[in-house]
Regions:
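Short, small-residue-biased leader/transition segments that mark boundaries at the very start
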Residues: 2-9
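Solvent-exposed loop/turn segments at secondary-structure junctions
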Residues: 19-22, 47, 54-55, 79-82, ...
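Surface-exposed cleft-lining segments at the edges of enzyme active sites
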Residues: 50, 54-59, 91, 120
């Protein structure tokens, strides 16, 4: 993306001046502060989050990538780092990572288990090889599947009419 880079092994965060300039359009200091807080919520999550085991790496496995970026945006969503429901992308799939997955993970927290985000992060050490479906079953029970929960979420937020 054009606004930051991932946290590297030394936990540095690079914040693009181009993104700062865009966020400060119309000299709106409040918007700039809000966006900077959101970026920090996302990027600092990378410094502390756990990584899926047994499935490759960020650059080699889309599941790994979707988990990493989805969790970082879930922390941002959960802490008011986006402009509420209006910032939620419509449709898509949890494998899209970032906000699409982030809003879904927070919905799981709000509707299935208040400790979901913490448990989901921890699942990367307990479900090996890690998968979305394996983590869901580990946290919520064998009767749940990631795809069924995604469908339930899409209906609940009005993206799918039944």
């Amino acid at each position: 993306s054009d606004w930051s880079s991932d946290v590297c092994s030394s936990d540095l965060i690079f914040y693009s001046t181009r993104h700062i300039e865009k966020s400060f359009a119309k000299n709106d200091t409040a918007k700039l502060f809000f966006e900077t807080r959101g970026v920090l919520l996302h990027e600092l999550t990378h410094a502390y989050q756990l990584e899926p085991q047994g499935i490759g790496s960020y650059g080699t496995n889309r599941v790994f990538w979707a988990f990493i970026e989805g969790m970082a945006d879930a922390v941002r969503v959960a802490n008011g780092g986006f402009d509420g429901p209006n910032a939620r992308p419509k449709g898509g799939n949890y494998m899209d990572g970032y906000r699409t997955a982030g809003y879904f993970f927070v919905w799981l927290r709000d509707n299935k288990d208040p400790e979901f985000l913490r448990k989901f992060n921890r699942s990367t050490l307990e479900v090996i090889p890690w998968s979305f479906d394996g983590a869901i079953k580990h946290i919520l029970g064998k009767e749940y599947s990631i795809d069924e929960l995604w469908h339930e979420y899409q209906v609940a937020v009005g993206d799918i009419q039944v």
